[in-house]
Amino acid sequence: MRTQWDIVIIGAGPAGMSAALQATRHGLSVLVLDRQAEPGGQIFRSAGSASADKRKQIGADYARGEALVREFRQSPATFLGGANVWHLAPGRAYVSHQGTSHVMQARQILIATGAMERPVPLPGWT
């Protein structure tokens, strides 16, 4: 597995994918890490494999997410899904992937971890 990159991006949601696309357009080597198996983040989760019914139900914004995921997948950026970043140091990201630890070296590290769903317990919410 390659371990030296110009940029390591943590998070494959809309911000992480967009940053990766911009960086690759400038000829930089890019590794995008995400704990989920597929890119898209919380908002475009499973955008690349959504059924026609789901796309119709969710609407036009989801279609834009599908286009972003498709462009990201076709880019020269490397995506490593199922990766857990457990430590950061200047120029280094310590990552566990499929039971093995790796040290990814980068000139820059971008943290784009995005949003997380969180239920807000209100009286009668269940």
Region locations from a protein language model:
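Hydrophobic anchor at the start of a short beta-strand
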Residues: I7, L28-V30, I109
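Conserved N-terminal Rossmann-fold NAD(P)-binding element of oxidoreductases
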Residues: I10-G11, L33, I111
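Short beta-strand to alpha-helix junction loop
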Residues: S51-R70
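FAD-binding core/adjacent interface of flavoenzyme oxidoreductases
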Residues: M1-W5, R64-T126
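Beta1/beta-strand and adjacent pyrophosphate-binding region of the FAD-binding site
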Residues: M1-A15
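Residue-level detector of alpha-helix initiation sites
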Residues: G13-A15, E38, A115-E117
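Glycine-rich FAD pyrophosphate-binding loop
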Residues: R25-I43
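Gly/Ala-rich phosphate-binding loop of Rossmann-like dinucleotide-binding domains
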Residues: A20, T24
